């Protein structure tokens, strides 16, 4: 699936929490040929970053933790250099992330990350999911919610952090392809991604366009 037999294919899945990006990454690992290394936000934030610096690259929009915010560009740079190194060794990489630039000031992280993978085959996928479905998924995982609940829950206001994610994560909206997890299963999303890879990454690719985006 790579344009160069000596480099691994890279797939970046960009979306908000509960958008279904992690499930797509797992489907790719299970279904695609060869090893696909998952270097996404959950691995980096939960298992690599020290607890006192979490949520690391998962820092949500809103500029709420300036002590962590100042480290986020460094964390992302190191992660993307690791992705580049895996690809250089011929390993395929899938990374589910939540890129945004809603910090105390614009940091230009996505453009910087794109430059770090400039010479590699990268498919940048926007993972979309309507906010009402995101809320359903959040409610379904609440530990105190009755599994046998029969009455429809009363409408709840969408929390501000959820709205911020929905507004910020798909800016500037430059992708090679998009999937909507409200209409496609993770397996179907993975198959759509496979089809795009077999067809070829558009030229110029999303990451090539993002290198010059401000």
Which ranges hold each PLM region?
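Small-molecule kinase domains that catalyze NTP-dependent phosphoryl transfer to phosphate-bearing small molecules
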Residues: 128, 136-192, 203-214
């Amino acid at each position: 699936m790579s344009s160069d037999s000596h480099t691994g294919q890279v797939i970046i899945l960009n979306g908000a929490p509960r958008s279904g990006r992690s499930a797509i990454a797992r489907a790719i690992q299970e279904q695609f040929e060869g090893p696909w290394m998952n270097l996404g936000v959950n691995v980096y934030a939960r298992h690599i970053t020290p607890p006192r610096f979490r949520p690391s690259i998962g820092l949500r929009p809103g500029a709420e933790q300036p002590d962590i915010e100042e480290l986020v560009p460094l964390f992302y740079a190191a992660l993307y250099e690791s992705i580049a190194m895996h690809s250089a060794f011929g390993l395929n990489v899938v990374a589910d992330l939540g890129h945004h630039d809603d910090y105390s000031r614009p940091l230009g992280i996505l453009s910087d990350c794109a430059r770090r993978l400039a010479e590699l085959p990268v498919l940048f996928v926007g993972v979309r999911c309507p906010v009402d479905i995101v809320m359903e998924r959040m409610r379904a995982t609440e530990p105190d919610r009755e599994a046998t609940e029969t009455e429809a829950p009363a409408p709840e206001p969408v929390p501000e952090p959820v709205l911020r994610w929905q507004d910020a994560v798909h800016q500037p909206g430059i992708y090679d392809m998009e999937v909507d997890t409200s209409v496609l299963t993770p397996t179907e999303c993975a198959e759509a991604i496979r089809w795009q890879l077999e067809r070829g990454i558009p030229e110029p690719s999303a990451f090539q366009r993002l290198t010059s985006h401000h």
